[in-house]
UniProtKB/Swiss-Prot annotation:
Highly expressed in inflorescences, roots, and siliques. Expressed at lower levels in mature flowers. This is Glutaredoxin-C7. Pfam families: Glutaredoxin. Belongs to the glutaredoxin family. CC-type subfamily. The keyword Electron transport applies. Has a glutathione-disulfide oxidoreductase activity in the presence of NADPH and glutathione reductase. Reduces low molecular weight disulfides and proteins. Involved in flower development as a regulator of petal primorida initiation and further petal morphogenesis. May mediate post-translational modifications of target proteins required for normal petal organ initiation and morphogenesis. ROXY1/TGA protein interactions can occur in vivo and support their biological relevance in petal development. May be involved in the regulation of the floral regulator class C gene AG (AGAMOUS). SUPFAM superfamilies: Thioredoxin-like (SSF52833).
Length: 136
């Protein structure tokens, strides 16, 4: 079995070029951009989601203190979740793979599958080091 050695879909929110690509900047995307840049590691989560709990545990177990935004408790959680689903390219608002969503160094890493694949293939630690979230 082979794993991809580079992070998938990593890009800065500002590189989306809201105006340049003909995309209309909506409030959800602007909130994501702002929140994703507040800390080296940012996790958008739901407080009752077991996959979200696992990702938070992974980072905390590595000695990383992520900023966690529980969307079910956030006043704009619904807008943010819909915008995250669009960013990930998920088909529906109840898409099972949509949360958690992780940003490292302001760049979108992705949902649980991409975070775990990056961890398994060894590319997660360098991302964390580059973002200043991990000192090894």
């Amino acid at each position: 079995m082979q794993y991809q050695t580079e992070s998938w879909g990593s890009y800065k929110m500002s590189s989306l070029g809201f105006g340049g690509l003909g995309m209309v900047a909506d409030t959800g995307l602007l909130r994501i951009e702002s929140l994703a840049s507040e800390s080296a590691v940012v996790i958008f989560s739901v407080s009752t989601c077991c996959m979200c709990h696992a990702v938070k545990g992974l980072f905390r177990g590595m000695g990383v203190s992520p900023a966690v935004h529980e969307l079910d408790l956030h006043p704009y959680g619904g807008d943010i979740q819909r915008a995250l689903i669009r960013l990930l390219g998920c088909s529906g608002s109840s898409s099972p793979g949509s949360l958690p969503v992780v940003f490292i160094g302001g760049k979108l890493v992705g949902a649980m599958d991409r975070v775990m694949a990056s961890h398994i293939n060894g590319s997660l630690v360098p991302l964390l080091k580059d973002a200043g979230a991990l000192w090894l």
